[in-house]
Amino acid sequence: MAPPKAEKKPASKAPAEKKPAAKKTASATDSKKRTKTRKETYSSYIYKVLKQTHPDTGISQKAMSIMNSFVNDIFERIASEASKLAAYNKKSTISAREIQTAVRLILPGELAKHAVSEGTRAVTKYSSASN
């Protein structure tokens, strides 16, 4: 047990000399831990859409949480259905067609029509911007 104690003392002395560097790495690891625990949400996008439609209306944290859960749920349903459609057609890639069909299957009537038209418009805008 004496040799490990002797080894620990010189090791603790060496980092003591490099404390400023150790603090930087410690703060870097702390910030990395914070980024790992950070939860990604659609809050900023929901807020932007709210301000486009109702500029003088706000939203509470609870309502924002509900909206975020709603968006996550719809996203999960569409992705799951699109995945099934790709599997049925023996394809390993989900394309815009699978997403469009999944939206038509999941959303009811007029809502599906509007979603498909808005999605098509967004894809067209993205394609023209990237060229």
UniProtKB/Swiss-Prot annotation:
UniProt keywords, alphabetically: Acetylation, Chromosome, DNA-binding, Isopeptide bond, Nucleosome core, Nucleus, Phosphoprotein, Ubl conjugation
Query: What organism is the protein native to?
Result: Scheffersomyces stipitis (strain ATCC 58785 / CBS 6054 / NBRC 10063 / NRRL Y-11545)
Region Disordered, residue ranges: 1-39
The record's GO molecular-function terms, alphabetically, read: DNA binding; protein heterodimerization activity; structural constituent of chromatin
State whether keyword Transcription regulation applies.
no
Q: Where is this cross-link: Glycyl lysine isopeptide (Lys-Gly) (interchain with G-Cter in SUMO)?
A: K8, K9, K18, K19
Kindly list the places in or outside the cell where this protein is found, as annotated in its UniProt entry.
Nucleus; Chromosome
**By what name is this protein known?**
Histone H2B.1
